[in-house]
Amino acid sequence: MNTRLLSIAGCSWAVAGLMAALLTPSVTAADPPPLERVQTIALKGPVGGLDHLAVDARRGRLFVANTVNNTLDIVDLKAGKLLKQVPGQGGIRGIDYSAEVDRVFVGNGTGGVCNTFDGDTYELIKSVPLGDDADNVRYNPGARRIYVVHADTELSVIDARDYTLRSPIALPKGLGAFKLEAGRPRMYANAKEGHVMVIDTDKDEVIGRFPVAPAGVNAAVAVDEPNHRLFIGCRKNPALVVMDSDTGKIVASVPIPGDVDDLSFDARRGRIYASCGEGAIAVIRQIDPDRYESLATIPTTGRARTSIFNAEAGQLYLAVPRSADRPDQVNPEVWVYQARP
């Protein structure tokens, strides 16, 4: 692998942008790809969008928000096939799975509800109405709370013990993806006007606001907790922005394709995977906490922009909507990529 460094630590943004544009990696034919597509799994549904995914690693199950079909799709990863579709999930968008409580949490945009399902039987346990446009969902096992993006400006908080609503967390318009730390009571929420909101999950209060400029429309987030690094995927001036999770200081920026929607951090291999609706997965290597380089750009297909990484299997799952532009594609799909080496 003959790659050239894209770190911008200690450089001005202008110089960094020029360097990032000029110094692109070159991959020889002998190099194995960092991600190899190994399987295609067919779902069912019409032309239209898919949204977020979640993984039950113990059972080998993948959950897919089949938005256009209004179903929660459950994939058997071992068999490589669609296992079940749970109907009645109007405009399903966000999904999270918690092994600690063996529950699947779903945010439905139409009708704005958060549904909780049994992780074994997939029976509905509780439906909590929030109002229109429920979206991303995360479960906090320490506090036993469910967080749901709602109405584009609010983070609804549900007590998972009795499913009562707590006081919501008001945030700037354009609220998108968010991520919780496992080791301390911190949450990082993307406000797409150009800030990452830092939230204390013990108090459910905003305690910080980190700008991502000159990038913007920050849509995706991942965390490297041991090294105190935030990875922010931005659609304006498309880039992976790396910042100190304690101070908000930007330490690096690497160009990526447009329309990013999901990021995953592969801690074992020191990589970040960015799935982009422009038709590619960007693979970025972490040299050290302050230095990063573009390792590869894996071609995919247009509008396939949501994904999740299964660390136990070393696999990335990409949601590929059924498209009118691909008449040979008769179903929405999940593309399975194996991380190499």
Briefly describe each language-model feature range:
Residues P25-P341:
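Predominantly soluble domains enriched in secretory-pathway, periplasmic, or organellar proteins
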